[in-house]
């Protein structure tokens, strides 16, 4: 049976930790593994970190850039070298590849999101393995994925993948960082993210990367909502992917949600960047969270931020606790005028007719 696999390999697995130089032996095994799976009929996406790390090695920099401009310049150097090496390795196995560089903006606008989906489908039909990275050279802080764990989860959601493999510098998730606490207990299966409330996930994984275990857990949650099974496993042993697909209990597997969120709501929940907040009274919170209702103007007690109609906003209770996200039918200036008012009063207040709901339930997803 044909399956869609998204494989993310981190900088710590791709490079030597002290120098930032590429680990060609790891890349060779990764390429051979993915090419073999592709020949077996699987659809493969590789999300590869390493552009900044490789760029540092190429330019002789001893540490990761601290400023955005320098990081973007170094990424431009490293991305070209990284893709050249991938192309050389995949070409020896007659496996075509494609470079796909994404920014958050490509997923924020619905039409661009759908265009990206269609592009991936055509690449699959052509037998190509897309190699994805964030377009660091043009990304801005407001529209950055932040790490490739998040990017890989959003790509897995976008392409409706069956599996997301997060290849990292540990063999699985532990109750604490095993490098700091030798008695940390391995975790083989996670049925619900809530099970990990007591896990000490630490922060940054390595000096060359940007993600730690916390970002991988978040990625697993995003993917799980899309019905994608996520596995955290050892990055320097890419053959583990085949073994896991064959049924071996390696790494940590995150079970997907039994009832995945539909594609549009996944887009609202994770791809969009909220531009404002709406604070709601208790009745509105209950109507949305417990009864599945749309948000009406009467339930809004405060409007925060400047946004336009159809922008994404956070929906919060009076204390500021996020309860959901949604697409608004009014801009922030209009909402400041109609907040707390009944729907039938809106035409009189604004001087024109508008939507009865501020956020329709079809455009609302609970957090």
Swiss-Prot record:
Enzyme Commission no: 2.7.2.11
Pathway annotation: Amino-acid biosynthesis; L-proline biosynthesis; L-glutamate 5-semialdehyde from L-glutamate: step 1/2
Localization, UniProt: Cytoplasm
Cited function: Catalyzes the transfer of a phosphate group to glutamate to form L-glutamate 5-phosphate.
Record InterPro entries: AceGlu_kinase-like_sf, Asp/Glu/Uridylate_kinase, G5K_ProB, Glu/AcGlu_kinase, Glu_5kinase, Glu_5kinase/COase_Synthase, Glutamate_5-kinase_CS, PUA
UniProt family annotation: Belongs to the glutamate 5-kinase family.
Keyword annotations: Amino-acid biosynthesis, ATP-binding, Cytoplasm, Kinase, Nucleotide-binding, Proline biosynthesis, Transferase
Annotated positions binding substrate: 49, 136, 148
Protein name: Glutamate 5-kinase
Chain ranges of the PUA domain: 275-353
Record: residues binding ATP: 8, 168-169, 210-216
GO molecular function, one term: ATP binding
Record-level GO BP terms: L-proline biosynthetic process
Predominant cellular place of this UniProt entry's protein: cytoplasm
GO cellular component, one term: cytosol
PANTHER family noted in UniProt: GLUTAMATE 5-KINASE
PROSITE patterns attached to this UniProt entry: GLUTAMATE_5_KINASE, PUA
Pfam families: AA_kinase, PUA
Highest taxon in the source lineage: Bacteria
Catalytic activity: L-glutamate + ATP = L-glutamyl 5-phosphate + ADP
Gene: proB
This protein's record includes keyword Nucleotide-binding: yes
């Amino acid at each position: 049976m044909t399956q869609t696999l998204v494989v993310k390999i981190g900088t710590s697995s791709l490079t030597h930790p002290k120098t930032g130089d590429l680990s060609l032996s790891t890349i060779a095994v990764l390429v051979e593994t993915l090419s073999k799976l592709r020949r077996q009929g699987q659809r493969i996406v590789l999300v590869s970190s390493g552009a900044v790390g490789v760029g540092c090695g190429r330019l002789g920099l001893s540490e990761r850039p601290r400023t955005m401009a320098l990081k973007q310049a170094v990424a431009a150097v490293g991305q070209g070298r990284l893709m050249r090496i991938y192309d050389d390795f995949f070409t020896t196995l007659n496996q075509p590849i494609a470079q796909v560089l994404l920014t958050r903006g490509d997923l924020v606008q619905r039409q661009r999101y759908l265009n990206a989906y269609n592009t991936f489908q055509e690449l699959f039909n052509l037998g190509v393995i897309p190699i994805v990275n964030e377009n660091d050279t043009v990304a801005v802080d407001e529209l950055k994925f932040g790490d490739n764990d998040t990017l890989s989860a959003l790509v897995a959601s976008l392409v409706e993948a069956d599996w997301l493999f997060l290849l990292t510098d540990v063999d699985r998730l532990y109750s604490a960082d095993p490098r700091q606490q030798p008695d940390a207990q391995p975790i083989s299966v996670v049925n619900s993210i809530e099970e990990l409330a007591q896990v000490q996930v630490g922060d940054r994984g390595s000096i060359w990367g940007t993600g730690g275990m916390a970002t991988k857990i978040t990625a697993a949650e995003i993917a799980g909502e899309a019905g994608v099974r996520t596995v955290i496993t050892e990055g320097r042993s890419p053959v583990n992917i085949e073994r896991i697909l064959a049924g071996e209990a390696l790494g940590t597997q995150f079970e997907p949600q039994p009832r995945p969120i539909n594609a549009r709501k996944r887009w609202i929940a994770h791809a969009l960047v909220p531009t404002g907040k709406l604070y709601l009274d208790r009745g509105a919170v209950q109507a949305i969270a417990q009864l599945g209702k749309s948000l009406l103007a009467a339930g809004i007690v405060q409007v925060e931020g400047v946004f336009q109609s159809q922008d994404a906003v956070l929906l919060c209770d009076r204390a500021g606790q996020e309860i959901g996200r949604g697409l608004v039918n009014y801009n922030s200036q209009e909402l400041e005028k109609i907040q707390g008012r009944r729907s039938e009063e809106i035409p009189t207040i604004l001087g024109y007719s508008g939507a009865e709901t501020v956020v329709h339930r079809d455009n609302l997803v609970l957090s």
